[in-house]
Structure formats: C-alpha cells, structure tokens
C-alpha cells in the first residue's frame, strides 16, 4: 500500500508539473498573439537565427533525477539516426555542439542499430553511438548535463546488430529481448558511448509480433513465440540496480504492450517505463486515442517522444509538386518510409503546406511547432542532415519565435479529420511524388 501511495503522489506531482508548464506555454502564446495580432503565427526567418537556449520545460514521464525531483527535458530532443550514413563524424559533432552548447538541448537519442537505413552501402551498426561517444570524450563535463537515450533492437534473427554486441563482433546473431541479450546489448552500448551509465534505455520495438512501421492492422496469423515481458523487465531492473541505466522506456509499442509492461514492473517491484517513442506527426496521429489515455500523467505517466515528426522529411515539403531532391532521404533510399509519399499523404501534405503559407512559416516549422502544442508530447525527436535544417527545427520549439494560433490549430485539425492518418491507408499505387 505504501508503494501504491508513493506511486499516486508521484503521478500527482508529475501532472502538476505538466499543468504548470502548460500554463506557461499558454501565457506565452497569448502574449505572442496579442503583440502580433495581424498574423496567425509568430515566426522567424532563416536570416534571423537565434542562439537562445531552450528551457527544460517538460518532465520525462514519472522519471526522477538524482535530486529526487522530476527529470526535466527540453521540448526538443536531438535525433541522431543519420550520423554515419548522411552525416560524417565531424558533422555529428557540429550538430551536438550547436544543439547542446548553443541552444541548451539536454536530450540526445540514439540506438544500437543506428545509423539508418541499414540498406545504405557501408552501413555498420553502432556507428552512431561511436560518434556520440567520441563527442562525450571530447566534452566530459557535459555528460552530466544531458539526458542520453539509446535503444536495444527488438526481434530480429540473424542480425549484424546482434553480432555487434560481442567482443570481438560476430558476423550476425539474433536480436531478442531475453535477459542475456538485454544485459549484453547494454554493455556494448556503454562501450561505444564511452560512458558508464545510460539515462534512458529503450526497447526499440517489441520481441513479440505487433503491427509496426506502417502496418495498419493486427494480423493474428503473424503471432510468434516471444520472450516473456516479465523476463525483459526483470533484466532492465538488474541494469537499474547496477547503475548502468537510470530509467527505461518503450518504443513502437501498442496500448496492450504498455499495459503489460506496467503490470510486469509492478509485479516485480521494478520501476515503470517512463517514456514511449512512437511514430507521430501530422500524417500519423494514432497515438491520440488509447495510447494517450494509458500514458496520461493521471494514469501511467509515460511521456511520448515522437519520432519522424516530419514524416521522414515529407513534411518539409521537399517532395511536393514533382520535386525529387537528389539528397532527399526518400529519394536516396527508395525502400525507406515510402508510405509518406503515397497519394493520400501527398494530398494531406499539400493541404498542410497551404496552412503553413497562410501562417507565414515553413511547412517543417508548422509540423514541429504543432507537436509542441500536444499535451502528451514530452520531447519531439528531430533529425537533420544540414546545420540549416537543424537550426530551423530547433527554432520551431522556441515559443518566443513560433507560436501557432488557435485558428491555425483548427485548420490543421480540419485537414486531419478530412484525411485522417493517410500514411496508414494501404495502397499498391506507386508514390505519386516520385513518379
């Protein structure tokens, strides 16, 4: 009963912190709209880039820092999956320097299998973690200033990622979420990251079958034997007890999965997951229903970390109107995230582009700033291949620069309700934007 009471108090404190942060955001929004009433949106141009540091504005779910207080993170998290494919080590360090040192971003996300896509010639799992590790080695005093998150790969038999956990590496090994794999993968990530602890250790995708990565329905014929969730949670509890990780989170999970992980944690006396990293953007808003309820501060208090908030780059508008940018990820890697270039997605993206023009911002800025308005979004994971993209993306989370009006938000919802989650619509048609 004592543990339950403590849990209730923790949830109450976290909800109060969220509401307090929300009040500040609403107050900022009102001031911005009042001072610039002639515009739907307060915006900045690329010519007026800022170096203002962002505040640590949101609690990371139920997580507590070393001081026992809510663990606060910036509303934007630096994603790193292009480090090692489209970005060199020098590029990676420059992005980390800018985001962390100049803009105050205190949240960095990576994974043992990064970079992606793995179809890229020369791909090597773990490269991204290695780049981050060399940056940490160059900036040792900053290690305690950032929340470092990485991920263990889920079910993937005969994978080079699994083989990379061994010393020396093996050509391949199964990726599973059993106890031995969880402990081994964590140790391998610690070595590559050149640190002795990971702030947030996430399960990249489930060990069991679950519809993911564009799959829109659950197919019971695809069910398979899976590692018991209790075994995975117990292993994560061992890592917490050993001081190797401080918190753990889920990724690409369903409402059923979230509930099962919480139940297993409570039965084992292990802390609950504090975050969930799922696909979420203007073209994919399925999180808003059952998952949002389960993860709410008043329930399991699990913060959403949206990945691909720009739909693989499609919500930058770079693939609209017949454009095929040679350096665009969806052009360079034609098997990667093509669902965002389907005809239904292109139609919705064009509608959002029109709203962005009316608001006086880029489509990318609109898409990211919209994520910031969602009460369940703790920190939105951004990725960039150029410094210009990175600066624009971070600026979208500065409320003094970009605040979407109620009118703009209503227009966004109108498009959504007319073209709900278009990336989930099955289609055999070739991507319209790349024909």
Show where each model-derived region lies.
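N-terminal binding-site loop/beta-alpha segment at the start of enzyme catalytic domains
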Residues: 39-151, 180, 196, 241
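Aromatic/hydrophobic pocket-lining residues that form the small-molecule binding cavity
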Residues: 92, 128, 182, 186, ...
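Active-site groove signature of glycoside hydrolases
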Residues: 191-214
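An active-site-proximal structural segment forming one wall of the substrate-binding cleft
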Residues: 178-197
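Beta/alpha (TIM)-barrel catalytic core signal, keyed to glycine-rich beta->alpha loops juxtaposed to Asp/Glu
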Residues: 57-62, 116, 206-415, 431-435
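N-terminal chloroplast transit peptides
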Residues: 1-24
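Surface-exposed, active-site-proximal loop segments in enzymatic domains
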Residues: 117-123, 157-176, 209-218
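Active-site mouth loops of central-metabolism enzymes
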Residues: 80-90, 167-183, 220-226
